[in-house]
């Protein structure tokens, strides 16, 4: 089954060019199926890009999925047209009385700030607490993962001496978990961050399980509450050219910008990036949807608790 997306969402036309089948709301209403309801709290500056990246991954499942986009009342985006936000996004207050089968919390370019100094931190905390009783399984990404680990479990973040930037090999530590079904022994994950969470801090917290990590980039996936929460420190959702755009953007601002590791062919930025993470990204999201959302959520969505 395809994704059900709001009519006129830009991602629809972009993904049709990639031969991904999506369905707008008007057509989806003709199918008498209870779709899975996934809400995305999109904190990234380039919201349309992030929408497309996530919708692309959510499309690789036979299940019908209805996607909602949540915005913060305490923050006004500067890089996305207000008309787009008004048409496709709803405030937390509008969505808080509803329940969802799954939720995705994206990263945000604020990782060097203390959490309490972030203008929308109180609203984020409220949303995180709400998700525990209104969502079957929540996927926290990059800064979202760090923020979730800090809010729920007190896990601190630590500054890195150098930006973690590139594609890094990850090892699944418990291949028997459904989230890793079909995975190879190693898988690649894009990373782009200035801070980290550390194994020694996570190991102090009962109920947190490190399920994937890298000898070079550290902890990559943490699971909690039997899969009702996943914290992913990298960006499996990134498009092939995302790190290239970040590299060239930063190069235009200063001269001491390192190449993203393990990304360009022969480490030559004039060459095309090597896409080594796409298959596992699709598998990760499909496994999350199938084993931790679809198979765990009640048929009557109001029974989620």
Predicted feature residues:
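Short, Asp-centered acidic motifs that coordinate Mg2+ and/or phosphate
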Residues: 102
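Cysteine-nucleophile active-site neighborhood
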Residues: 105-174
């Amino acid at each position: 089954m395809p994704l059900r997306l709001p009519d006129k969402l830009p991602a629809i036309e972009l993904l049709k060019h990639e031969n991904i089948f999506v369905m707008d709301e008007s057509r989806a209403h003709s199918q008498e199926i209870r779709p899975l309801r996934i809400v995305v709290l999109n904190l990234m500056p380039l919201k349309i890009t992030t929408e497309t990246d996530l919708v692309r991954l959510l499309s690789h499942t036979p299940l019908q999925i209805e996607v909602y986009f949540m915005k913060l009342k305490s923050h006004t985006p500067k890089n996305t047209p207000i008309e787009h936000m008004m048409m496709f996004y709803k405030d937390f207050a509008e969505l808080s009385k509803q329940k969802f089968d799954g939720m995705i919390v994206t990263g945000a370019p604020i990782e060097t700030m203390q959490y309490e100094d972030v203008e929308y931190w109180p609203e984020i905390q409220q949303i995180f607490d709400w998700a525990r009783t209104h969502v079957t399984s929540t996927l926290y990404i990059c800064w979202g993962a760090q923020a979730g680990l800090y809010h729920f479990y007190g896990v601190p973040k630590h500054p890195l001496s150098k930006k973690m930037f590139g594609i890094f090999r990850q090892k699944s530590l418990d291949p028997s978990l459904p989230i890793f079904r079909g995975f190879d022994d190693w898988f690649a994950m894009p990373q782009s961050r200035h801070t980290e969470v550390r194994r020694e801090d996570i190991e102090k917290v009962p109920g947190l399980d490190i399920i994937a990590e890298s000898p070079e980039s550290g902890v990559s996936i943490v699971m909690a509450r039997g899969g009702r929460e996943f914290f992913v420190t990298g960006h499996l959702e990134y498009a092939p050219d995302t790190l290239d755009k970040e590299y060239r953007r930063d190069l235009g601002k200063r001269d001491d910008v390192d190449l993203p590791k393990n990304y360009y062919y022969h480490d030559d930025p004039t060459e095309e990036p090597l896409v080594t993470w796409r298959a596992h990204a699709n598998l990760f999201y499909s496994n999350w949807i199938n084993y931790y959302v679809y198979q765990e959520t009640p048929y009557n969505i109001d029974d989620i608790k």
